[in-house]
Protein backbone atom coordinates (compact mmCIF):
# COMPACT_ATOMS: atom_id res chain seq x y z
CA UNK A 1 0.00 0.00 0.00
CA UNK A 2 1.29 3.41 -0.93
CA UNK A 3 1.43 6.34 1.45
CA UNK A 4 0.02 9.68 0.27
CA UNK A 5 3.36 10.93 -1.13
CA UNK A 6 3.96 7.77 -3.14
CA UNK A 7 0.34 7.73 -4.29
CA UNK A 8 0.73 11.25 -5.70
CA UNK A 9 3.84 10.21 -7.65
CA UNK A 10 2.01 7.13 -8.96
CA UNK A 11 -1.06 9.10 -10.03
CA UNK A 12 1.11 11.71 -11.81
CA UNK A 13 2.92 8.92 -13.68
CA UNK A 14 -0.34 7.19 -14.63
CA UNK A 15 -1.79 10.45 -15.96
CA UNK A 16 1.26 10.92 -18.17
CA UNK A 17 1.34 7.28 -19.30
CA UNK A 18 -2.36 6.88 -20.12
CA UNK A 19 -2.30 8.70 -23.44
CA UNK A 20 0.93 7.09 -24.60
CA UNK A 21 -0.22 3.58 -23.72
CA UNK A 22 -3.66 4.10 -25.25
CA UNK A 23 -2.12 5.30 -28.52
CA UNK A 24 0.25 2.32 -28.56
CA UNK A 25 -2.45 -0.24 -27.68
CA UNK A 26 -1.82 -3.55 -29.44
CA UNK A 27 -4.68 -6.03 -29.12
CA UNK A 28 -2.38 -8.90 -30.11
CA UNK A 29 0.06 -8.56 -27.22
CA UNK A 30 -0.33 -10.66 -24.09
CA UNK A 31 -1.08 -9.16 -20.68
CA UNK A 32 2.52 -9.89 -19.71
CA UNK A 33 3.87 -8.00 -22.75
CA UNK A 34 1.47 -5.12 -22.09
CA UNK A 35 2.47 -4.97 -18.42
CA UNK A 36 6.18 -5.03 -19.35
CA UNK A 37 5.68 -2.15 -21.78
CA UNK A 38 3.75 -0.20 -19.12
CA UNK A 39 6.45 -0.96 -16.52
CA UNK A 40 9.17 0.46 -18.79
CA UNK A 41 7.18 3.60 -19.57
CA UNK A 42 6.14 4.19 -15.96
CA UNK A 43 9.74 3.69 -14.79
CA UNK A 44 10.93 6.36 -17.22
CA UNK A 45 8.18 8.74 -16.14
CA UNK A 46 8.74 8.19 -12.40
CA UNK A 47 12.48 8.75 -12.90
CA UNK A 48 11.68 12.08 -14.58
CA UNK A 49 9.55 13.28 -11.63
CA UNK A 50 11.85 14.98 -9.08
CA UNK A 51 10.25 13.18 -6.12
CA UNK A 52 10.27 9.89 -8.02
CA UNK A 53 13.96 9.97 -8.85
CA UNK A 54 14.79 9.96 -5.12
CA UNK A 55 12.83 6.80 -4.25
CA UNK A 56 14.53 3.70 -2.89
CA UNK A 57 14.20 0.53 -4.99
CA UNK A 58 11.28 -0.92 -2.99
CA UNK A 59 9.25 2.30 -3.13
CA UNK A 60 10.07 2.74 -6.82
CA UNK A 61 8.80 -0.76 -7.67
CA UNK A 62 5.72 -0.30 -5.47
CA UNK A 63 4.86 2.90 -7.36
CA UNK A 64 5.34 1.18 -10.74
CA UNK A 65 3.21 -1.84 -9.74
CA UNK A 66 0.49 0.45 -8.39
CA UNK A 67 0.55 2.28 -11.72
CA UNK A 68 0.12 -0.95 -13.67
CA UNK A 69 -2.72 -1.93 -11.32
CA UNK A 70 -4.40 1.42 -12.02
CA UNK A 71 -3.94 1.19 -15.76
CA UNK A 72 -5.05 -2.40 -16.31
CA UNK A 73 -6.47 -3.91 -13.14
CA UNK A 74 -8.48 -2.74 -10.11
CA UNK A 75 -6.10 -0.14 -8.75
CA UNK A 76 -5.41 -0.13 -5.02
CA UNK A 77 -7.89 -2.94 -4.31
CA UNK A 78 -6.04 -5.32 -6.66
CA UNK A 79 -3.76 -6.39 -3.80
CA UNK A 80 -6.81 -7.61 -1.84
CA UNK A 81 -7.98 -10.04 -4.53
CA UNK A 82 -5.60 -12.94 -3.76
CA UNK A 83 -7.00 -13.13 -0.22
CA UNK A 84 -9.61 -15.88 -0.54
CA UNK A 85 -11.00 -15.11 2.92
CA UNK A 86 -12.45 -11.84 1.56
CA UNK A 87 -16.01 -12.24 0.31
CA UNK A 88 -16.72 -8.57 -0.45
CA UNK A 89 -14.80 -5.32 -0.97
CA UNK A 90 -16.58 -2.02 -0.39
CA UNK A 91 -15.19 1.36 -1.43
CA UNK A 92 -17.19 4.06 0.36
CA UNK A 93 -14.72 6.90 -0.18
CA UNK A 94 -11.10 7.23 -1.30
CA UNK A 95 -9.84 6.52 2.21
CA UNK A 96 -12.74 4.39 3.42
CA UNK A 97 -12.33 0.83 2.10
CA UNK A 98 -13.83 -2.17 3.89
CA UNK A 99 -13.72 -5.92 3.37
CA UNK A 100 -16.00 -8.68 4.56
CA UNK A 101 -14.32 -11.75 6.00
CA UNK A 102 -16.35 -14.54 7.59
CA UNK A 103 -19.35 -12.24 7.85
CA UNK A 104 -17.40 -9.50 9.67
CA UNK A 105 -16.68 -6.08 8.19
CA UNK A 106 -13.20 -4.65 8.66
CA UNK A 107 -11.69 -1.41 7.46
CA UNK A 108 -8.49 -1.95 5.46
CA UNK A 109 -5.60 0.47 4.92
CA UNK A 110 -6.21 0.79 1.18
CA UNK A 111 -6.34 4.34 -0.13
CA UNK A 112 -7.27 6.00 -3.39
CA UNK A 113 -5.89 9.49 -4.01
CA UNK A 114 -9.30 11.14 -4.38
CA UNK A 115 -12.78 10.68 -5.88
CA UNK A 116 -11.35 11.06 -9.39
CA UNK A 117 -9.01 8.13 -8.75
CA UNK A 118 -11.97 5.96 -7.69
CA UNK A 119 -13.92 7.04 -10.80
CA UNK A 120 -10.88 6.33 -13.02
CA UNK A 121 -10.80 2.72 -11.81
CA UNK A 122 -14.57 2.29 -12.12
CA UNK A 123 -14.76 3.78 -15.62
CA UNK A 124 -11.81 1.93 -17.07
Regions found by a protein language model. Name each.
Residues 12-124:
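N-terminal "pre-motor" subdomain/linker immediately upstream of P-loop NTPase catalytic cores
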Residues 6-9:
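Long, compositionally biased regulatory regions of eukaryotic proteins
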Residues 1-4:
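Short, charge/polar-rich alpha-helical segments
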Amino acid sequence: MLNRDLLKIERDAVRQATGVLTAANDATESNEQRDTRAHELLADIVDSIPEGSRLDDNSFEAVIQAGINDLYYLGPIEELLPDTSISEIMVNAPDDVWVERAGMLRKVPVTFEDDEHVKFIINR
